[in-house]
Amino acid sequence: MKYTDVFVEMVHGVGILFAGHFTCEGLIDDLVYQDLHERIDRTRFSDPLEDSGFQYGFNSTYLKKVVSYWRNTFDWKQQVAVLNKYPHFKTKIEGLDVHFIHVRPKHRGDQRVLPLMMVHGWPGSFYEFYKILPLLTQNHDGVSFEVVIPSIPGYGFSEAPHKKGFNSLAAARIFLTLMERLGFSQFYLQGGDWGSLITTNMAQMRPDRVKGLHLNMCMSTRGFKVLLSMMIGPYLPFLVGFSREDVRRLFPFFEKNVWEMLKESGYLHIQATKPDTAGRGLNDSPVGLAAYLLEKFSTWTHKRNRDLEDGGLERKFSLDDLLTNVMIYWTTGSIISSMRFYKENLGSNPNDRIDARTGIFVPTGLAAFPQELLHCPRSWAQIRYRNIVSYTFMPQGGHFPALEEPRLLAADVIQFAKKVEEL
């Protein structure tokens, strides 16, 4: 990264001291790029099984195409220019350099500007939100958003924690401090994957400051009510608060939930137990890293992509976008520290944590995308989220909606905020 001098940014009349505004030109290092190409050139490919698609993981035949594009066509300098499209900042919080993007609407006029923090997850990064940013910062019938997008410590340009125990509660505490430094007394939150847990924790910690919480991933809680609805739901859905769409997405339950999770959660067990072991190989091999990360962008976008030779990757994403995300992990060497976040949150029983036993009372909006890893009906979400003002069955999309379906996600965030603002 290339830093300017230390400076004070005026935000809402408040002077905020930062370590510096920076650009990403420092990522364009000829020696680093030469090293990347040398490592790519030394890749040892293996042959996939016949007609295996992505059922065994990233298909090696298609991987050769991706790697060839990466080596011969992908223009990292051009993508760094794209990264620099929005202003980047760093500030030190609790001893860690925390990276974030801060984008204000271009034309304020008479419009109401609502502060919004959006938080990514794994294997994503701040770059996930680049397509949705211009949609949220434009005027929507008098409403627009001033957007803050931080990188979770240990991801991308944020410094990695140096001590054990940095979990979602710690990240939530740091991001609350960030919004306070930026001068926002109240604000909206949006998140998916780890971002949904972090923003939920923020709403639990400071409900007085969180005007609204919007999630595109919601994990259900356990208990008798959930168990009973699983038993009765397929036959008498109205008795347990299920809609027809809930039934379609949930059942048969074992096939769509238990079996699917068994097929797709192997990575989770590794990262929640021994992240440094697997991460060591990924941090050393760019092609291994790309295969590991991009396989998730295939399967988590649509489960049927497992049956395709190319994993359906280019149906929703461009190789430039996918490889830019990979390069953020590669150039910052952050794959191991990002994987550790699983162990910090799942290394012990998450149901024993205080946040698992604490309700969420701020206005909440849920966008239920049909290809999300697990479907959470409104009746299940209400067990924890006590003030759901918006629940939308999204027509299409999976785990990465800001990158897959930015218009759909933006529209739902906007309508949710308008409901909360009573516009």
Briefly describe each language-model feature range.
Residues L135-S144, L182-G241:
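Conserved hydrolase catalytic core segment
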Residues I270-L423:
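C-terminal subdomain of alpha/beta-hydrolase-fold enzymes, centered on the catalytic histidine
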Residues R112-G121:
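Short beta-strand element of the alpha/beta-hydrolase
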Residues E94, V148, I152-G192, S220:
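Active-site loop/oxyanion-hole signature of alpha/beta-hydrolase fold enzymes
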Residues W76-Q78, Y127, I152-F166, T200, ...:
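Glycine-rich "HGGG/HGxG" loop immediately N-terminal to the catalytic nucleophile
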Residues G20-H21, E25, L31-Q34, I40, ...:
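Alpha/beta-hydrolase
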Residues Y33-K106, Q111, W330-D352:
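Non-catalytic accessory segments flanking enzyme active sites
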Residues W122-P134:
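The serine-hydrolase catalytic nucleophile loop
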